[in-house]
Amino acid sequence: MKLIFIFLTLLIFVSSCTSILIKESSEEERIYPFNPVASPFDPRSLNQILKIGKIGYCFDCARACMRRDRYIRTCSFERKLCRCSYSHIHHTHG
């Protein structure tokens, strides 16, 4: 019985670490297109790309919080910071 419990505990631990690593690697593969040849020094193009990156990062942060049944508390694209609330989302049944 102890062996089964230890095995299941290790399995849960390994699977949670694996999912975190997979999520981080998939985030690194995201590329937001910026073509400096088309607009070499156009700050508006660069600002648009940064807005897309910020929106995408905070959207992913919100989805991660919702998967944990929590609200998003803080999202900072510049500092790569995503924090969820301590309280759970209250579901209303109508």
Curated annotation (Swiss-Prot):
Disulfide bonds join 58-75, 61-82, 65-84. Coiled coil: none annotated. The lineage of its organism: Eukaryota, Viridiplantae, Streptophyta, Embryophyta, Tracheophyta. Binds to PRK6 LRRs. GO terms for cellular component: extracellular region. It is found in: Secreted. GO terms for biological process: pollen tube guidance. This is Protein LURE 1.1. Pollen tube attractants guiding pollen tubes to the ovular micropyle. Keywords: Disulfide bond, Secreted, Signal. InterPro entries: DEFL_AtLURE1-like (IPR047497). The keyword Cell inner membrane does not apply.
